[in-house]
């Protein structure tokens, strides 16, 4: 997945969840933050960030904040990227063979899952989560409590009883992590729900990514520790 019109900047501040002030070519610009998570460990004043200039002259903000440098690690922050990456990954023949249908944003009961996939043998629901939180080479999710995430997990479990297969895919938007864990400290209920789902037969995968200036792509599967 490639981004056009990428520029380097220096993060100044984040007045609210939706915008950031970034210094670009010695000028302070207002950028749209494509991630409403806290990201407090990433967006630190003085941090190098990469932003994308918008092609839409009518937008209130002329740039999108795409990625950030944390130490020696390049981390993509675009919350829209994980779904696109998983779709690209499946279209390349990874994960499932014999796919006959891929439908995004598919409703089941009270939830809307990211993907519904059919193969010659199976009907599958997939929920995708983007991961930007890393500590000591360990990737974690979530970075803030997510009741919606808990509901999705429980309804994925329900789908098993109706004959579907179910997957939760954590897209780690960086590389070189050792393994993935649920962030029990931040949201114990999510962690417990994920462990319960695994015991019931929901497939839990974590995939890391190659991240470069203006580029991100799924690389390989990472160990999940529950």
Curated annotation (Swiss-Prot):
GO terms for molecular function: DNA binding. Transmembrane segments: none annotated. Coiled coil: none annotated. Gene3D superfamilies: 2.40.50.580, 3.40.1350.60. Pfam families: SfsA (PF03749), SfsA_N (PF17746). It comes from the Bacteria. Belongs to the SfsA family. This is Sugar fermentation stimulation protein homolog.
């Amino acid at each position: 997945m490639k981004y056009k019109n990428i520029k380097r900047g220096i993060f100044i501040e984040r007045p609210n969840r939706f915008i950031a002030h970034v210094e670009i070519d010695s000028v302070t610009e207002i950028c749209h933050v494509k991630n409403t998570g806290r990201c407090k460990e990433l967006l630190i004043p003085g941090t190098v960030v990469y932003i994308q200039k918008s092609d839409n002259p009518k937008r209130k903000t002329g740039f999108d904040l795409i990625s950030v440098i944390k130490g020696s690690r390049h981390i993509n922050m675009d919350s829209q990227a994980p779904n696109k990456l998983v779709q690209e990954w499946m279209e390349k023949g990874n994960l499932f063979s014999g796919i006959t249908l891929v439908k995004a944003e598919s409703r089941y009961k009270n939830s809307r899952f990211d993907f519904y996939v059919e193969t010659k043998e199976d009907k599958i629901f997939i929920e995708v989560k983007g991961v930007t939180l890393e500590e000591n080479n360990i990737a974690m999710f979530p970075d803030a409590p997510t009741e919606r995430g808990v509901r999705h997990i429980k309804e994925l479990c329900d789908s098993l009883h109706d004959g579907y297969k179910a997957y939760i895919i954590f897209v780690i938007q960086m590389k070189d992590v050792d393994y993935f864990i649920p962030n029990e400290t931040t949201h114990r209920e999510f962690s417990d729900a994920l462990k319960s789902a695994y015991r019931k037969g929901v497939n839990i995968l974590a995939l890391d990514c190659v991240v470069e200036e203006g580029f991100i792509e799924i690389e390989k599967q990472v160990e999940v520790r529950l």
